[in-house]
Curated annotation (Swiss-Prot):
Source organism (scientific name): Ectopseudomonas mendocina (strain ymp) (Pseudomonas mendocina)
Stored PANTHER family: 60S RIBOSOMAL PROTEIN L11-RELATED
Any one GO biological process: translation
Top-level lineage group: Bacteria
InterPro entries xrefs: Ribosomal_uL5, Ribosomal_uL5_bac-type, Ribosomal_uL5_C, Ribosomal_uL5_CS, Ribosomal_uL5_dom_sf, Ribosomal_uL5_N
One term of GO molecular function: tRNA binding
Any GO CC annotation of this UniProt entry: ribosome
Name of the molecule in the record: Large ribosomal subunit protein uL5
Protein transport in keyword set: no
Keywords: Ribonucleoprotein, Ribosomal protein, RNA-binding, rRNA-binding, tRNA-binding
Protein family membership: Belongs to the universal ribosomal protein uL5 family.
């Protein structure tokens, strides 16, 4: 079992049950999935960009990546319907907790000028989104083998009913929020 999952079950869930005054331990908010998305506008001119982004995300997550395609043509962006414009991957269960552990303990401390995560990046339903400016903060990526620095979006989907519950859950996981 993943280290963070064990900590959640034994320490975080009982603590949150008391803190949020919930009747049942099954009501305690939990993280259901983590979605990583890389929007690649530059892929329009060069198809190799998609292949490199797929390789990077597969190294980071250890899971097969899905290529996202344009839903409709937009002349202003020179995009045609069906063209590949991004890559995404959804992590659940064990892989999700393993990734979260690596993100919190290894990757975020490697971010340049890191002052903490924005505590206001919740969507109103307890889900948290954050952006990473460069993929080299992950230890799986070899700095010498990348062709370009690419950012990615990370979204944590929770069962929390509102932002306060979601914030309490992520604080219990020791997320480094700015004050």
């Amino acid at each position: 079992m993943a280290r963070l999952k064990e900590i959640y079950r034994k320490e975080i869930a009982p603590k949150l049950k008391e803190e949020l005054k919930l009747a049942n331990v099954m009501e305690v908010p939990r993280i259901t999935k983590i979605t990583l998305n890389m929007g690649l506008g530059e892929a329009i001119g060069d198809k190799k960009v998609i292949e490199n982004a797929v390789a990077d995300l597969e190294k980071i997550t250890g899971q097969k990546v899905v290529v996202t395609h344009a839903r409709k043509s937009i002349a202003g962006f020179k995009v045609r319907e069906g063209w590949p414009i991004g890559v995404k991957v959804t992590l659940r269960r064990e892989r999700m907790y393993e990734f979260l552990d690596r993100l919190l303990s290894i990757s975020l401390p490697r971010v340049r000028d890191f002052r903490g995560l924005n505590a206001k990046s919740f969507d109103g339903r307890g889900n948290y989104s954050m952006g990473v400016k460069e993929q080299i903060i992950f230890p799986e990526i070899d700095y010498d083998k990348i062709d370009a620095l690419r950012g990615l979006d990370i979204t944590l989907t929770t069962t929390a009913r509102n932002d306060d519950e979601g914030r309490a859950l992520l604080r219990a996981f020791n997320f480094p929020f700015r004050n």
